[in-house]
Amino acid sequence: MKKLVLSFIIALMGISSTAFAQSKITGTIVEEANGKAIPFVNVGLFRQADSVFVSGAASDDKGRFELLAPNGDYRLQVSAIGFQTFEQLLTVKGNQDLGKLKLSEGAMKLSEVVIAEKRPLFAVEGEKTMYNVAEDPSIQTGTASDALQNAPGVEVDVEGNITLRGTSSVEVWINDKPSHMTAENLKTYIQTMPANSIDRVEVITNPSARYGSNADGIINIVTNAKIQKNEFFSFGVNASTQPYIGPWMSYVWSNEKLTVNAYINGGFSNWKGYNKVEQSLFTDEGILANHERDSSNYSSKNYNAGGYFSIDYEIDTANSLNLWFSCWPSWGGGTNYTATQREEFLPNPLNTAYIESSDAYNRNFFANGGLYYMHKFDNKGHNLSVSVNGMGWGGGNGGDVKRQFTAPIEYTHLFRQENSSSSMGAEAEIVYNRPYSENGEISVGYTVGYDPEKQYLKTDSLVGEDWVNDVYRSYKAKFTNLNNEAFITVQHKFGGLTVKPGIRFVSELVTGEYPYTFPGDTTNYDFRKPFFSVRPSLHLSYRTESMHNFKLSYTRRIAAPEAEQLSRFPLYHMDSYSTGNPDLERVYTNSLEAGWTKYWNSFGSVGLSAYYRGKSNEVNTIQLSEYHWLYDRIVQYSYPVNVGKSHTTGLEYNMMYRPSGFFNLRFYANLYDSYIYTEYNGQPYEFDKWSYSFRLNMWAKLWNKLEVTASGYYSSPTQTLFSERKGWYGINAGLRADFFDRKMSVYVNANDIFNWNSFGNSNNSPSVQSTSNYKFNSRSVAVGVTFRFGKMELEQRARQGEGESGGSPQGMGGM
């Protein structure tokens, strides 16, 4: 075994040394007319045999550049705005200096002032913060992943996971429409697509009425290239010490009209952790009723598989069609051991102790599919699109549970549960975009959706030798949500000022049905509640020639309560119970945000934003205690309520130091005040708490092959109604390397290096006081390898002409 391991290490070292056996090619870029050095020029090295990109760099402020490549025959290409493209054939046999490479002046030379006015590196227009990738010479030789690292607020870790402002609740769109990609497909896309095929990246942190998305933000990648010919196959495996292992494969075939995309994956994970809870229940008079301590250890083993298939067909220059389908089943099980000690003081003194052990299973299934059709009336953004989506999911869990009591007497209680839920919904949307001038565009759309859900719970207890149904812990229910939505937005540019008002109309019908009730219970728990809301938005932005960007936005969102929150049907758990609240009203949210950002091409950016999010009728869960005959003791009872009013007021600071396209250091900080006011039983309750968080990220790409990332973060305690979440923090670091002309990539990522991650909550309601601490195996090392085969030939399109999304005007994005 030792010899085998030694041989493997020697072989790996040999591969690494071969992959990094590089020769150095240097030179200086100068103007042919006067010999003046040309800074920040794109220099690329391509294989003569097949034109595959091998290495690239940008010249420094003195025109000097340096490339690394294995020995071989290459074509050197130098390009810069205002100059003719320079090409030279090279045979590399060792380090060599090419001396001065002279560029001739081209026919289309733009002054620096004009470039800054029309296409700055960073800009804010309406709700969008844009990173104009096509104007960044230092990133042209990288990948889409490299470009995203430079978009304000966007982070991509070494595994390819994308976050925005530190949250993963973000949708990635490509050419103004949702990508519908799986996580692994998206990772492959951004890690292989050349950065020079991207026109710009648009970041939307406060979506307008145009978007029905529930995500915290949207990242829209707008390309300036069309896949002309492509046959691409990739496969790999990801693993971690948690443990987790997941193999996957992806295949893409394309020609000028048709693209076929197929993906399959599998996975196994094993999560372990522990949880500790202390809880005290009080009467309305403030007298202690009981005190309970729980300590749990659990493990969960899960398997998953999945597949994705899509077809994109360009019928002609004016019509295109996209079809897709995905399916993701998962299954597994877990064990749990909980030790409980409870001291009861009211209504009767009693000490209870037991150990609960369970062996559970779970099965889940998710599938969705749809089609997207677009008709382009011209190549200036005038288009009509229709989309239809269907989604179905189902699953359940259950198992046997044993409670071994040691007090007040020794006995065993055995019960089993079977819980399932399922849904089969659909949604259709039609959107019409029409530019009414070179500086303005109007968009209108209509969406209709239907989302039903069925729930089922069955509980049986062992009585003697027979399993007897527990009718109070068994039920069936059906919920439906029917929504109709329409929106209209207008965007107009007045020089550097962009104005975008919009409005969205939403009609919802929420229903619930309970076909069975408890013995002797004649209550009708069915409900049917309609809701209607109007959601206006306004986004203003202004930018100067010196790249000062100002923005001001207002949005109003109105959310109807969830179906389960409206039900009065009591859900009896083993030691507590809960109900909904049919008197819940809609939640109104008014958001106001103002910001300033200054961008420098050679430094990066500094930004400051102030925001206010005020809510009325926010839904929170209140926890009470009361005696219930089913338990014959005082237990916890919870139900949702509308908080009287709440608001969050904060200040965000972000700084990005970016001396080149392959290195950046970013600091993000958020300081905010959370205020909540409500009344319960005629008694007012008021909470006011300041919280803060910050994150420091470093990303670098070395020798065009090796990525290095590191991040540290901290979030202080936060407050909600009668509840406080404890602070959390951690440090991550990672490496990713490309080998063999990006045919193979390997990453290593260390998560929560010092094992600091733990989570906790405390509750301090009038009747329930509790603390809980939760810890899982967060410290881990993740590794992965990806192999890629194929070639992608890109046909660049003129920036002023047609884009894949329908050629919307620059900065408008078809929105």
Language model features with spans:
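Outer membrane beta-barrel strand-and-loop segments of large Gram-negative receptors
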Residues: 416, 425-429, 471-475, 579-581, ...
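Short acidic/polar hinge/loop motifs at secondary-structure boundaries
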Residues: 68, 144, 177-205
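Outer-membrane beta-barrel translocator/receptor signature
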Residues: 212-219, 227-278, 301-305
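Short, acidic Ser/Thr/Gly-rich low-complexity loop/linker segments typical of extracellular
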Residues: 48-64
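N-terminal periplasmic accessory domains that precede
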Residues: 97-102, 144-147, 186-188, 202-203, ...
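Conserved C-terminal beta-signal and adjacent last beta-strands/turns
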Residues: 538, 687-815
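Surface-exposed extracellular loop regions of Gram-negative outer-membrane beta-barrel proteins
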Residues: 509-511, 546-591, 612-634, 638, ...
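Short, acidic, small-residue-rich periplasmic hinge/interaction motif at the N-terminus
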Residues: 42-46, 79-83, 93-137, 157-159, ...
